[in-house]
Regions:
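Short E/K-rich amphipathic alpha-helical oligomerization segments
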Residues: 107-135
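Short, charge-rich amphipathic alpha-helices with coiled-coil/heptad character
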Residues: 58-89
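A composition-driven signal for long, intrinsically disordered, charge-rich low-complexity tracts
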Residues: 9-11, 15-16, 20, 88, ...
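Alpha-helical oligomerization segments
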Residues: 124-176
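Non-transmembrane amphipathic alpha-helical segments
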Residues: 80, 87, 94, 98-116
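N-terminal Sec/ER secretory leader and immediately downstream segment
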Residues: 1-66
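Heptad-repeat alpha-helical rod positions in long coiled-coil/spectrin-like domains
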Residues: 85, 89-92, 96, 103, ...
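Generic alpha-helical secondary structure signal
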Residues: 30, 47, 51, 67, ...
Length: 176
């Protein structure tokens, strides 16, 4: 079980120097903006993302290294924190829907029990409603399993952001 932290702070993932105000303009730099999009994508293996960051740093003239790399950190943070917040919002909606489904299942089960208790109950109707209840319960249980997996996604995004920020920090330290 993880505690809900709606937004990250830069200090949680960046242990380098304070980012200059100009780093906030990362979206206006096409090369930084494109790299942020690439490395933030979870489908790209972390090692490949780290290599892209290293290659980017190696391609920069010395005087552009620090400004561009701090823009990259700010961009990764802004992009991945927004993605993480979006996922958390989706998890919240999903969990709320699960609560509604659970209440509906309890009502459906109670109705089936009442129908079974009637001595003159139509057995075909009892069987049909029992099948519906079993199917709805199976769907509910599969959604519970999915919710468990989906709840890991914000942590996966955080860990990726930390690893990528650490790569930038190490790259900057190596160039000094």
């Amino acid at each position: 079980v993880q505690r809900k932290v709606p937004q990250l702070s830069l200090g949680q993932v960046w242990n380098g120097p304070e980012l200059p105000p100009a780093a906030k303009d990362w979206a206006e730099d096409p090369s930084v903006s494109a790299l942020v999009e690439e490395v933030a994508a979870r489908r790209l293996q972390i090692a490949d993302a780290q290599k892209k960051i290293s290659d980017f740093a190696a391609s920069l003239p010395a005087e552009q290294l620090a400004p561009k790399m701090t823009m990259l950190v700010q961009g990764m943070f802004d992009h991945m924190d927004a993605e993480r917040s979006h996922v958390i919002s989706g998890i919240s909606r999903y969990a709320h829907k699960q609560l509604e489904m659970a209440a509906a299942l309890r009502k459906q089960a109670s109705d089936v029990d009442q129908l079974r208790a009637k001595p003159d109950a139509d057995q075909d109707e009892v069987e049909r409603r029992t099948d519906q209840l079993n199917f709805a319960t199976r769907i509910f249980n599969e959604r519970v399993q999915s919710l468990t997996y989906v709840c890991d996604v914000p942590t996966i995004i955080e860990q990726r952001l930390y690893q990528l920020s650490k790569t930038v920090s190490e790259t900057l330290a190596a160039k000094k």
